[in-house]
Amino acid sequence: MRPKKDGLEDFLRLTPEIKKQLGSLVSDYCNVLNKEFTAGSVEITLRSYKICKAFINEAKAHGREWGGLMATLNICNFWAILRNNRVRRRAENAGNDACSIACPIVMRYVLDHLIVVTDRFFIQAPSNRVMIPATIGTAMYKLLKHSRVRAYTYSKVLGVDRAAIMASGKQVVEHLNRMEKEGLLSSKFKAFCKWVFTYPVLEEMFQTMVSSKTGHLTDDVKDVRALIKTLPRASYSSHAGQRSYVSGVLPACLLSTKSKAVETPILVSGADRMDEELMGNDGGASHTEARYSESGQFHAFTDELESLPSPTMPLKPGAQSADCGDSSSSSSDSGNSDTEQSEREEARAEAPRLRAPKSRRTSRPNRGQTPCPSNAAEPEQPWIAAVHQESDERPIFPHPSKPTFLPPVKRKKGLRDSREGMFLPKPEAGSAISDVFEGREVCQPKRIRPFHPPGSPWANRPLPASLAPTPTGPVHEPVGSLTPAPVPQPLDPAPAVTPEASHLLEDPDEETSQAVKALREMADTVIPQKEEAAICGQMDLSHPPPRGHLDELTTTLESMTEDLNLDSPLTPELNEILDTFLNDECLLHAMHISTGLSIFDTSLF
């Protein structure tokens, strides 16, 4: 069977010599599948590595600032062609060489890298104050959409997805080249593209085709199969039957097909592994370390999830009896409640759970109500340990504007089904009563926890402490009718601020001074430590992590004197950079994802 020729014309900006080598390699690979040659005789694995290396070198030479995107697209197209030719063969003629066995793993790695860089293009542009042209943004969105679709169906309809990805990528590159020739792209945008579009690491891509005996690339099928069995397996989502070895680097917005999962691409799951995918092992703070802090397992990410029910945590006497009655009669009296229309719609949306209190799913209590545990005095059940074990495998970061409840947990038969007391909200005085009587529209809007990067001292603090201090008004009494609320009486006069308490107030100059000091120490200590680690062989110097604003800030700080007078006006360059770091929390997280560093990783605060 002849090799397919439809994908050989979709490569981006290749020289005739590379195209000739590529055609010869695909032809020999098809002959290996037809058992005319052996993979070792024509060195398919080594030639595949060399052709991917040629893609990267060609993109670095002629791809300008977006050469990383061009190299990723060409490598993705190359492995898609190999997989298409393998699938077209019969089962007895395919899968007898190293490239055929490792092709799904390499395809998943390339797609993951393509999705990560396209996500970074949209996430980090606003935080770095980069304006994306409309034509480039539209073309990039189409590329990201096709990449996400292919990530779910990488083993199905390969020709259609491959052609769609390459067509969208070619359109993006053409728009970039045209606007660059016309002088419509600013230097900041081109530097941003060079920072975002990183090159794939071939050593990681071909790690499944390295012999454990010699340490070199091999075409021995037995060595490759034995190595693949030792790799950890991961799945895109719980309902997806396809599994992969490197899908653990995917963010949470790619782990489900529901639209709600992509509303907040900043809060990602498995970001510590995504750091390793982009820059190798780094010493930055991970989400796992921030999640398992001394303040509690889930306390760092929500103000409503406090702890598991136990005999040492009894509920309030009044609230317990009232909430138990509400939870038991919620299925029959949901239409007779005195709440507003929005709460009725929410009750109808939650009707499947409320009508079956003994279903296999975890029941979700209404807003403002404390769930009543069925057996509060019994010792901890085995299912609690099971929840801890499953949570260790995949961290869950709930959306700050959504109800903070974990998804239903898979359980074995024979365990208790009444799990209403799985998580208890934080007990606050009058919060449950006011929610029940006043309803959603009357209550004050819920305060959303501001996002802080992992490693920040504010990441594990409770919600009131992490929010900015705001003047708190008097507590209103519950209103049961439409009569206007009485005029609140003034409270006691505020106490005078003492000199000792004045130090606790926020000082912008002090915050700026601490930020400058932290950044200076990071530039003096963290970067030399990385260079020493690279010298010792723990990090490859040919793939340094992109730093973006960090390089510019370090250069600006080095040109200044040691004694920085904060009373005098700062330079415009330093003032803009400091404002970007201090006022934009998305940039802090974006820098942590891309570099593994954070200005709050030091112990100065």
Curated annotation (Swiss-Prot):
Q: Where is this region: Disordered?
A: 307-380, 447-499
Keywords on this record?
A: Activator, DNA-binding, Early protein, Host nucleus, Host-virus interaction, Transcription, Transcription regulation, Viral latency, Viral reactivation from latency, Virion, Virion tegument
Which residue windows does the record flag with biased composition (Low complexity)? 321-338
**Biased composition, Basic residues: where in the chain?**
355-364
Supply the InterPro entries for this chain. Answer: Herpes_TAF50 (IPR004998)
Entry GO MF terms:
DNA binding
**Localization, UniProt:** Host nucleus; Virion tegument
Please provide the Gene Ontology terms (biological process) for this protein.
positive regulation of viral transcription; regulation of DNA-templated transcription; release from viral latency
Composition bias, kind Basic and acidic residues: at what positions? 341-353
Q: Which cysteines are joined by disulfide bonds?
A: none
- Output the Gene Ontology cellular-component terms: host cell nucleus; viral tegument
State the Pfam families in the record.
Answer: Herpes_TAF50 (PF03326)
The UniProt function text for this chain reads: Immediate-early transcription factor that controls the initiation of viral lytic gene expression and lytic reactivation from latency. Triggers lytic replication, and initiates a cellular senescence program in epithelial cells. Up-regulates human DCR3/TNFRSF6B by directly binding to its receptor. Globally induces a proteasome-dependent loss of SUMOylated proteins in the host cell and the loss of promeylocytic leukemia nuclear bodies. Improves the stability of the triplex capsid protein TRX1 by reducing the ubiquitination level of the latter.
Family statement? Belongs to the herpesviridae Rta family.
* Subunit (UniProt): Interacts with human ATF7IP protein, leading to promote and regulate host genes in virus-infected cells. Interacts with RNA polymerase III complex; this interaction downregulates small RNA transcription and 5'-pppRNA production.
Q: What is this protein called?
A: Replication and transcription activator
